[in-house]
């Protein structure tokens, strides 16, 4: 087994194929008493994903998301910043034709302050907005959300179907992103859309550069960000989930973040 690992690389946690190599060690970037403090980044030659290894423990995830305050600083509250965020999401839902028709339904997963719901309500007030998050931090601060559910997605009472589901800077936090996408597919209407944004990689990074550029990457959040995805991984994974890529753009923030739209087929 060790010989195979040296020759072919270790099995990738995301695609399962041999080809995952270690880029190098990374340390926690969040000040907390985590159970695990020794992490490394791995890159898969087959699906081109970079992921954190080992996975954070359940206790560390609870510490990150349920026992901490995430949305109180000026990045989320300054009026100019709020206007900038809403302009981006409003422009995106228009240009990418994501806005449901009158009476349509929107689900925001890992919603936080539910920016997509807010942008959609501003354009079309009669859409129904549902937000889900495991933290209650923002649940009473989102007047633009018709129903804010605090709890796991599988416990969501409003099971859909939805015309639009958004996961904005959410999927990179998940230990099992494929399972989440399967749930998304089950909650979408036929031809419904999913809007996903997430960190991509350091500007201009290539695997031969190793781990060094990652250590100064603004989106290296250890252990919060578990996976840095690629278009290849989505293209390999989605057909079995009855989802299709209709838009991919990895040029955001000078190539540091991507925007993805999926369609239920």
Walk through the language-model features, giving the residues of each:
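Conserved N-terminal segment of class I S-adenosyl-L-methionine
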Residues: 1-168, 177-181, 195-197, 220, ...
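Feature marks short, surface-exposed loop/turn motifs that line or immediately flank catalytic pockets
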Residues: 138, 191, 202-204
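Short glycine-rich, flexible loops that bind phosphorylated cofactors or substrates
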Residues: 173-174, 203
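Helix-to-beta-strand junctions that scaffold the AdoMet/dcAdoMet cofactor pocket
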Residues: 174-175, 188-190
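Short, glycine-/aromatic-enriched active-site segment of Class I SAM-dependent methyltransferases
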Residues: 198-227, 232-237
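A structural motif corresponding to the C-terminal end of an alpha-helix
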Residues: 237-243
